[in-house]
Amino acid sequence: AAGLYWVLTSGNSNDGGIGLNSIPSNTGDKLSSGKSYYVYASEIELYPTNNEGKAWDTGDGGPDIKYHIKWLGNEIFESTVKDNSLLANWSGLQIDLKWSDLLGKTISPNEAIQAARLRYDDKGFIEIIIEDSDVAKDDAAGNLTMDLKTLRIGKNEQGYAKDTQNSVRRTVVTVLPIDSTIEDLAQFMRE
């Protein structure tokens, strides 16, 4: 486990190639037709009240934010829930280990990377469905549609106006090439 942590958090600044470490936020390269990408919401901020202008939960608790990504009409990813927060963050990396796992378990990149996987098409789009996760019934916070041609490699920040259908103030959607090295992915995802 310690070795995996070192691999995921160590950067290699002398690799001589074009690593993801050098891509600043909001200014990455355009996506390439036919190429596959990881896509996830690295940050979601909600307005202080729900779509009806009321408190998210009873008492003074904030919303329990989760999101789903749909592509080609199919749900391809569901996030973990971030409890009692108006501003939720996801790193794109998650490793759930038990003490028994520390004895020789290997983790594949597909297990560690928590993101949607899709192939770019300039006519394609994704839907991000954001909810307040509740025990009885999840409350809608917003359904956002993003044209893939508007996304860039790296972090893509977008703000939204509040109305009766939307309580999402802002999203940061991160897009990374699937063929990146695990070291580059880990470095970029932890930022």
What are these regions (language model features)?
Residues 72-75, 118-124:
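A short, structured loop/turn motif at beta-sheet edges
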Residues 20-66:
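C2/C2-like lipid-binding beta-sandwich modules
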Residues 63-75:
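Extended low-complexity, serine/threonine- and proline-enriched intrinsically disordered segments
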